[in-house]
């Protein structure tokens, strides 16, 4: 218990934008997350890592209320700017706009490249074409896609490559001005060149946004993360400064995972 308190105290040296307290999640009888106390530092890249089935993706989904599905049950607190997002007064649509999500497999909407980026604004009532044009261009430029697609904005998003589709999904998330971007293994289905472009993009974005990436790839976490959360069997084993954890992990489980003794 004392070790857990010490780890959390060290973690709180970072300014958190998200944090959980005694977070528990069940899928039916399966207890997926167990008393999870974690922080996500503001405007940094946090990597959530751990072996398959440990609860990484469940934790990510808990951060913007994507667990509101049949059979799932959530207990505990998740705070965004000190507001419990699971309270009765919290608006899930506002939460999901401020805390965007990008999934493992690129999921472009069945519409044009332009309309994919403009979609969120239109849903929120924006009709001004000049404003939509500006937002579409600005966010396609942010993800390094504008020069590749500016002459075919009305083409189907499905005509893009896998890496381009994933960058388009990130642009769509950025268009509604989130503060946090959650990414669930966003490069696992991409080739090495596309993976490198996504990683470079996330580094550029981290100065303006809080980035949280779930990854099973330790080397990717080493390349990207400033802060690390290690999960094993639904529990937080270790969290803190990435450099410190990778150089001097306090838990034998963390050390074994980093060495590749299990995955």
Residue positions per predicted region:
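Catalytic Walker B motif of ABC-type/P-loop ATPase nucleotide-binding domains
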Residues: 181-184
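Conserved ABC ATPase "signature" region
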Residues: 83-84, 130-150
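ABC ATPase NBD Q-loop/coupling interface
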Residues: 77-94, 154, 245
